[in-house]
């Protein structure tokens, strides 16, 4: 947006390949106060976000190292927040962890008589997000069960086996990729009218 405003302000600004941080720093040198204020606010927001991510990384390494090794600190923290605590996450089955964060989609699909969602917040995991659509449900189920195991270990025993869990999960994903390389043929479901 700052690039668009700058382009409107100056017809000579045609370099659209300028990185965002450099763009904001260039705008700070100008005397247009609106763009300057916007650039300052954006740079502060980026700095705040980076500091927040570092803080979450440190806390997750202390609180839930196995979950962090399996999902990453940001996704792990989001799952703990959705479960309202690591204790609740540790007591959940893998199938519920798989669907954490999909409440709106679940009830929307139920209302419209569609199939329920296969994954919730764990869709943000790169191995699920990057997988073909027909493999995502299987990978989500596997990740949900591994997160359930990791959260139980983090809450009850504090023993670190995150690397082994991550290796097992990656092996399972490879097996899914090999077992289901092609998309299944879509079947048309014929429903009979109830009379």
Predicted regions and their residues:
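Extended alpha-helical surfaces
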Residues: 33, 37, 44, 66, ...
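Generic structural signal for hydrophobic core residues of well-folded globular domains
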Residues: 5-9, 42, 83, 150-154, ...
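Phosphate-backbone recognition surface of nucleic-acid-processing proteins
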Residues: 81-156
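Helix-hairpin-helix/helix-loop-helix acidic hairpins
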Residues: 26-74
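Extended compositionally biased segments used for macromolecular assembly or nucleic-acid engagement
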Residues: 3-27
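A residue-level signal for conserved active-site and pocket-lining positions in enzyme catalytic cores
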Residues: 2-4, 147, 169
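Long, well-ordered mid-to-C-terminal structural blocks that present hydrophobic/aromatic surfaces
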Residues: 57-89, 94-98
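Low-complexity, acidic/Ser/Thr- and charged residue-rich accessory regions of DNA metabolism proteins
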Residues: 133-137, 141, 150-195
């Amino acid at each position: 947006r700052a690039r668009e405003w700058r382009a409107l302000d100056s017809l000579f600004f045609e370099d659209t390949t300028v990185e965002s941080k450099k763009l904001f720093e260039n705008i700070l040198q100008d005397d247009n106060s609106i763009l300057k204020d916007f650039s300052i606010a954006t740079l502060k927001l980026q700095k705040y976000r980076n500091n927040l991510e570092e803080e979450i990384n440190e806390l997750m390494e202390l609180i839930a190292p196995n979950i962090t090794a399996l999902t990453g600190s940001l996704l792990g923290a989001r799952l703990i927040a959705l479960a309202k605590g690591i204790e609740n996450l540790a007591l959940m089955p893998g199938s519920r962890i798989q669907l954490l964060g999909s409440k709106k989609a679940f009830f929307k699909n139920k209302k419209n008589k569609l199939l329920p969602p296969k994954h919730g917040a764990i869709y943000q995991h790169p191995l699920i997000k990057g997988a073909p659509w027909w493999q995502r449900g299987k990978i989500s189920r596997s990740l949900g069960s591994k997160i359930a195991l990791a959260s139980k270990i983090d809450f009850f025993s504090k023993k670190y086996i995150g690397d082994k869990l991550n290796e097992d999960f990656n092996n399972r994903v490879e097996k899914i990729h090999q077992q289901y390389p092609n998309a299944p043929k879509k079947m048309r479901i014929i429903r009979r009218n109830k009379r």
